[in-house]
Design a protein with these regions (language model features):
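Amphipathic, heptad-repeat alpha-helical segments
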Residues: 1-32
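Short, charge-rich amphipathic alpha-helical segments embedded
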Residues: 25-37, 45, 51, 55-72
Length: 72
């Protein structure tokens, strides 16, 4: 559960970091997907489904980390 919370915290920090940026349509869709994963992870945590929560939080974190990386 702690790892899941760390991933969600990291994802939130990544989203705050990219918030001021102008995002293209694809990036905006990715942000929506990230937020959906985060919401689903929180529901899974509340239902005690630790594995599902971790998997969703991990996906959200990976996507948010990709958005934070500078484009080349």
């Amino acid at each position: 559960m702690q790892n899941t919370n760390q991933l969600l915290t990291s994802t939130d920090a990544n989203l705050k970091q990219i918030a001021p940026r102008q995002l293209n349509s694809s990036q905006q869709d990715t942000v929506k997907q990230i937020k959906s994963y985060v919401d689903q992870a929180k529901v899974a945590v509340s239902k005690g489904d630790v594995e599902r929560a971790y998997n969703l939080a991990s996906k959200a974190n990976m996507l948010s980390a990709d958005l934070v990386r500078p484009s080349r």
